[in-house]
Regions:
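Extreme N-terminal tail/first-helix region
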Residues: 1-15
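Structural motif corresponding to alpha-helix initiation and N-cap regions
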Residues: 2, 48-49
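Alpha-helix boundary recognition
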Residues: 9-10, 56, 105
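Short beta-strand segments
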Residues: 12-47, 53-55, 62-67, 74
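A generic "binding-loop/recognition-motif" signal
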Residues: 47-48, 128
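Short, surface-exposed beta-strand-loop junctions and turns on beta-sheet-rich folds
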Residues: 49-50, 70, 138-140
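Proline-centered flexible-loop/turn and helix-kink motifs
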Residues: 57-59, 109
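Charged, gly/pro-rich active-site loop segments
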Residues: 76-145
Length: 145
Protein backbone atom coordinates (compact mmCIF):
# COMPACT_ATOMS: atom_id res chain seq x y z
CA UNK A 1 0.00 0.00 0.00
CA UNK A 2 2.93 2.35 0.72
CA UNK A 3 4.06 2.14 -2.92
CA UNK A 4 0.54 2.95 -4.12
CA UNK A 5 0.59 6.04 -1.91
CA UNK A 6 3.99 7.12 -3.21
CA UNK A 7 2.76 6.58 -6.78
CA UNK A 8 -0.07 9.05 -6.16
CA UNK A 9 2.49 11.62 -4.99
CA UNK A 10 4.78 10.98 -7.97
CA UNK A 11 1.94 10.83 -10.50
CA UNK A 12 0.42 14.20 -9.66
CA UNK A 13 1.67 17.78 -9.54
CA UNK A 14 -1.04 19.77 -7.77
CA UNK A 15 -1.87 19.72 -4.07
CA UNK A 16 -3.44 21.70 -1.27
CA UNK A 17 -0.88 22.77 1.34
CA UNK A 18 -2.25 23.29 4.85
CA UNK A 19 -0.20 25.35 7.31
CA UNK A 20 -1.01 26.62 10.79
CA UNK A 21 -0.14 29.79 12.68
CA UNK A 22 -1.38 30.62 16.18
CA UNK A 23 -3.86 27.76 15.92
CA UNK A 24 -5.40 29.09 12.70
CA UNK A 25 -5.23 26.89 9.58
CA UNK A 26 -4.41 28.27 6.13
CA UNK A 27 -4.77 26.36 2.84
CA UNK A 28 -3.04 27.07 -0.46
CA UNK A 29 -3.39 25.41 -3.86
CA UNK A 30 0.16 24.59 -4.97
CA UNK A 31 2.03 23.14 -7.92
CA UNK A 32 4.69 20.67 -6.86
CA UNK A 33 7.18 18.05 -7.95
CA UNK A 34 8.39 15.08 -5.96
CA UNK A 35 11.64 13.21 -5.66
CA UNK A 36 11.95 9.84 -7.41
CA UNK A 37 11.28 7.93 -4.18
CA UNK A 38 8.05 9.76 -3.35
CA UNK A 39 9.40 10.78 0.05
CA UNK A 40 9.96 14.48 -0.51
CA UNK A 41 7.85 17.13 -2.23
CA UNK A 42 9.20 20.40 -3.61
CA UNK A 43 7.13 23.58 -3.80
CA UNK A 44 7.70 27.26 -4.47
CA UNK A 45 6.35 30.34 -2.73
CA UNK A 46 7.13 33.99 -2.30
CA UNK A 47 8.76 34.58 1.06
CA UNK A 48 6.32 37.42 1.76
CA UNK A 49 3.20 35.25 1.91
CA UNK A 50 1.00 34.00 4.72
CA UNK A 51 1.90 30.38 3.93
CA UNK A 52 5.65 31.03 4.04
CA UNK A 53 5.33 32.96 7.29
CA UNK A 54 3.34 30.05 8.72
CA UNK A 55 5.99 27.56 7.57
CA UNK A 56 8.72 29.55 9.30
CA UNK A 57 6.68 29.61 12.52
CA UNK A 58 5.43 26.01 12.40
CA UNK A 59 7.14 23.55 10.03
CA UNK A 60 4.51 20.82 10.46
CA UNK A 61 2.23 20.67 7.41
CA UNK A 62 -0.39 18.60 5.68
CA UNK A 63 -0.84 18.14 1.94
CA UNK A 64 -3.92 16.86 0.15
CA UNK A 65 -3.29 15.14 -3.18
CA UNK A 66 -6.16 13.46 -5.00
CA UNK A 67 -7.00 11.62 -8.19
CA UNK A 68 -10.08 13.59 -9.26
CA UNK A 69 -8.43 14.53 -12.59
CA UNK A 70 -7.69 10.88 -13.36
CA UNK A 71 -11.25 9.90 -12.47
CA UNK A 72 -12.87 12.73 -14.44
CA UNK A 73 -16.05 11.49 -16.08
CA UNK A 74 -16.26 8.46 -13.81
CA UNK A 75 -18.18 8.09 -10.62
CA UNK A 76 -16.74 10.04 -7.71
CA UNK A 77 -16.61 6.96 -5.49
CA UNK A 78 -13.38 5.98 -7.29
CA UNK A 79 -11.50 9.14 -6.32
CA UNK A 80 -8.53 8.55 -4.04
CA UNK A 81 -7.62 11.26 -1.51
CA UNK A 82 -4.14 11.13 -0.03
CA UNK A 83 -3.38 13.17 3.08
CA UNK A 84 0.36 13.64 3.51
CA UNK A 85 1.83 14.75 6.83
CA UNK A 86 5.29 16.23 6.67
CA UNK A 87 7.80 18.82 7.72
CA UNK A 88 8.90 21.99 5.94
CA UNK A 89 12.61 22.31 5.19
CA UNK A 90 14.56 25.02 3.46
CA UNK A 91 17.00 23.93 0.77
CA UNK A 92 20.41 25.34 1.60
CA UNK A 93 22.54 23.54 -1.02
CA UNK A 94 22.63 25.78 -4.14
CA UNK A 95 23.45 22.81 -6.39
CA UNK A 96 20.45 20.84 -5.16
CA UNK A 97 18.25 23.91 -5.51
CA UNK A 98 19.37 24.36 -9.15
CA UNK A 99 18.56 20.71 -9.95
CA UNK A 100 15.12 21.00 -8.36
CA UNK A 101 14.50 24.30 -10.15
CA UNK A 102 15.28 22.71 -13.54
CA UNK A 103 12.95 19.79 -12.81
CA UNK A 104 10.26 22.20 -11.64
CA UNK A 105 10.53 24.19 -14.88
CA UNK A 106 10.27 21.01 -16.93
CA UNK A 107 7.09 19.89 -15.12
CA UNK A 108 5.59 23.38 -14.74
CA UNK A 109 6.82 25.60 -17.62
CA UNK A 110 3.90 27.97 -16.99
CA UNK A 111 5.66 29.01 -13.74
CA UNK A 112 8.86 30.24 -15.42
CA UNK A 113 8.31 33.91 -14.50
CA UNK A 114 7.42 32.96 -10.94
CA UNK A 115 10.55 30.80 -10.57
CA UNK A 116 12.69 33.64 -11.94
CA UNK A 117 11.32 36.11 -9.38
CA UNK A 118 14.02 36.92 -6.78
CA UNK A 119 11.40 36.80 -4.01
CA UNK A 120 10.39 33.22 -4.83
CA UNK A 121 11.77 30.39 -2.72
CA UNK A 122 11.90 26.68 -3.50
CA UNK A 123 11.43 24.54 -0.40
CA UNK A 124 10.76 20.94 0.50
CA UNK A 125 8.29 18.96 2.54
CA UNK A 126 9.82 15.81 4.02
CA UNK A 127 7.02 13.25 4.13
CA UNK A 128 6.44 11.58 7.51
CA UNK A 129 3.16 9.71 6.92
CA UNK A 130 0.33 9.03 4.49
CA UNK A 131 -3.37 8.47 4.96
CA UNK A 132 -5.15 7.20 1.85
CA UNK A 133 -8.89 7.22 1.43
CA UNK A 134 -9.54 4.86 -1.50
CA UNK A 135 -13.11 5.54 -2.59
CA UNK A 136 -15.60 6.48 0.08
CA UNK A 137 -14.85 3.96 2.82
CA UNK A 138 -11.46 2.23 2.54
CA UNK A 139 -8.76 4.02 4.55
CA UNK A 140 -5.08 3.12 4.95
CA UNK A 141 -2.29 4.68 7.02
CA UNK A 142 1.48 4.33 6.50
CA UNK A 143 4.48 6.03 8.07
CA UNK A 144 7.89 6.62 6.51
CA UNK A 145 11.04 6.05 8.54
Amino acid sequence: MLEKMKDIVKGNDLCVLATVSEGKPHCSLMSYISDEEGQEVYLISHKETKKYSNLMENPTVSLLIDTREEEKGKRRIYIKALTVSGEFQTIKDPGKKDIIRAKFLKRHPHLTNFLNDPGAEIFSIRIKSFQLLDGVKDAFFETID
